[in-house]
């Protein structure tokens, strides 16, 4: 996709009504510090539109990033951060559940998994939760640049086995450093939202 414009369009908190912008949406879920903001910045060709942080749990809202007035990339709150109180975890869970239940424009949910580690219990729970809400999660294996090339296939297999993925389920390795996987992700987004894949640096 040629990125002509990318803006943070809507920020939703726990009491916010999910907006109906009329634009197709693709959402990104994953545990805290898995690299969601870095991925979204990479997709938008922006360095810091989606705020990144070394501190897990930074994203506490649902953030809608409007691309070319054509579609929204939706950044969901991260899960699994140990220092978050049970009340906060419940609040974030309700926000995500509310979004999945009420969005009329959601076309796909991407679930991000750190390629260096086996899927956690929280990852498996989120995968099942997305399925339960009627979406087939597309898996993005993040932090590819942190792994030796010789380990990649073994770790991708561990992700497939850990999530008990169906045969043929898409798993895309992604590197925030080299942008490997970016084109493949955009091609999927374009096919899911009805656009034509093209590219601009």
Protein language model annotation of sequence segments:
Residues 65, 142, 185:
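Residue-level signal for inorganic ion chemistry
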Residues 22, 48, 61, 88-92, ...:
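Helical mechanochemical/support elements of P-loop NTPase systems and associated helical scaffolds
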Residues 3-15, 146-201:
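Canonical P-loop GTPase G-domain recognition
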Residues 43-47, 100, 163, 189:
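Hydrophobic aliphatic residues
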Residues 18, 56-63, 77-107, 115-129:
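Switch II of P-loop NTPase G domains
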Residues 1-83, 194-195, 199-201:
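Conserved G1/Walker A P-loop phosphate-binding module
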Residues 97-169:
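Conserved C-terminal guanine-recognition region of P-loop GTPase G domains, centered on the G4
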Residues 58, 71, 78-81, 116-118, ...:
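Conserved nucleotide-binding/hydrolysis micro-motifs of P-loop NTPases
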